[in-house]
Each structure stands twice: as structure tokens, then as C-alpha cells.
Amino acid sequence: MAQGQGFGFGLGKMKELAAAIQKAQQVQEGAKKLQEDLERMDIEGQAAGGAVKVIMSGTQEPRRVEISPDLLSEGAEVLSDLVTAAMRDAYQKSTATMRERMEELTGSLNVPGLG
């Protein structure tokens, strides 16, 4: 074996490996912070012009449901439909927020295949 050839893992490869490890650590730290941020968020979905509201976290954890007293006389089926619509709205907003934040995280790190 000629001098400097070793196992094909020279100084250049070591620098690449160190950079890859550093990026992986950045992704891990960023993902942890993102998870914490998403858990703290309150994202609101609405139906009936805001008469029914569903609030969930950025990780789609339900927090609360608010129903205008004016709707209580509408009956169970109508209320059920409105709550379901508000839940869908909140879920869509929450998943869109999560997706956007993930794209921001991975895009800023320039990790191939993630951004």
C-alpha cells in the first residue's frame, strides 16, 4: 500500500464526515426546538363564521372547543357537523403550519433530499 492511501478515508473524507455529523446535530437540535414550538402553538379552526371554534396545538393535540350559546338550540346533529367542520379546519391549519416549519428547518440546513 502506497503512503497516504490508507483505507481511502483521507483528510478530505474526514472533513466531509465531520461536516455531515455537524449537520445531523443541527437537524436534531432544530427538530427538537420545532417540536417544542409546535406543542406551544394554539391554532384555531372555525365553522359557522366563528360561532364554533376548535383550538389545537401545532402537533394536532386538541386543546378546547368553543361553541356560541346561540347555536345550542340548533340540535345535536347540526352542532356535531359544525364541530367536525371546525376540527377539520384546525387540523388542516395545524398540519400546514407543521409542514411549513419543517420546510423552513430543512431548507435552511441545505440537507440533500430534505429541503
Curated annotation (Swiss-Prot):
It is found in: Cytoplasm, Nucleoid. Pfam families: YbaB_DNA_bd. Homodimer. This is Nucleoid-associated protein tlr0723. SUPFAM superfamilies: YbaB-like (SSF82607). NCBIfam families: DNA_YbaB_EbfC (TIGR00103). InterPro entries: YbaB-like_sf, YbaB/EbfC. Binds to DNA and alters its conformation. May be involved in regulation of gene expression, nucleoid organization and DNA protection. GO terms for molecular function: DNA binding. Belongs to the YbaB/EbfC family. Coiled coil: none annotated. It comes from Thermosynechococcus vestitus (strain NIES-2133 / IAM M-273 / BP-1). Keywords: Cytoplasm, DNA-binding. One of its GO terms (cellular component) is bacterial nucleoid.
